UniProtKB/Swiss-Prot annotation:
The modification Phosphoserine is found at residue 77. It is an enzyme of class 5 (isomerase). The keyword Nucleus applies. The gene is PPIA. It comes from the Eukaryota. Pfam families: Pro_isomerase. Catalyzes the cis-trans isomerization of proline imidic peptide bonds in oligopeptides. Exerts a strong chemotactic effect on leukocytes partly through activation of one of its membrane receptors BSG/CD147, initiating a signaling cascade that culminates in MAPK/ERK activation. Activates endothelial cells (ECs) in a proinflammatory manner by stimulating activation of NF-kappa-B and ERK, JNK and p38 MAP-kinases and by inducing expression of adhesion molecules including SELE and VCAM1. Disulfide bonds: none annotated. Its main location: cytoplasm. This is Peptidyl-prolyl cis-trans isomerase A.
Length: 164
């Protein structure tokens, strides 16, 4: 089985920044990977296209995926509002790791974050389900629009997304 690859075309205040592609670890966390894949294609009638990265902290991570409220309080999974932590086999080993944001145990929806550093304190709390395959330089460029409290100086959006 080949792990799926999805892409995000990132824009800054409506201007194209570039493409980031992700390998989704369907071999280790199939349910979590399938949620992200389907939200990237929009095949269920909802998903990431047009949503923003509402929280970017340089030297830590870029967080997005709230396509219902756009502020970090919303989002939903393809399985209903929330789903369980599938497993914690994969670790937050460094830049480029793709992991689920949550509000405590078994509260995965659609929010995710891309690590820009090793974040081992998140191991066992957040489900790692993918990695940046290409376009880490775009993620690094996104960091410049973040701040210590996570507020972004410009609107960073997923202008387009899908499966490769």
């Amino acid at each position: 089985m080949v792990n799926p690859t999805v892409f995000f075309d990132i824009a800054v205040d409506g201007e194209p920044l570039g493409r980031v592609s992700f390998e989704l670890f369907a071999d280790k966390v199939p349910k979590t990977a399938e949620n992200f894949r389907a939200l990237s294609t929009g095949e269920k009638g909802f998903g990431y296209k047009g949503s923003c990265f509402h929280r970017i902290i340089p030297g830590f991570m870029c967080q997005g995926g709230d396509f219902t409220r756009h502020n970090g309080t919303g989002g939903k999974s393809i399985y209903g509002e929330k789903f369980e932590d599938e497993n914690f086999l994969l670790k937050h080993t460094g830049p480029g790791i793709l992991s689920m944001a949550n509000a405590g145990p078994n509260t995965n929806g659609s929010q995710f974050f891309i690590c820009t550093a090793k974040t081992e304190w998140l191991d066992g709390k957040h489900v790692v389900f993918g990695r940046v395959k290409e376009g880490m330089s775009i993620v690094e460029a996104m960091e410049h629009f973040g701040s210590e409290n996570g507020k972004t100086s410009k609107k960073i959006t997923i202008a387009n997304c899908g499966q490769l």
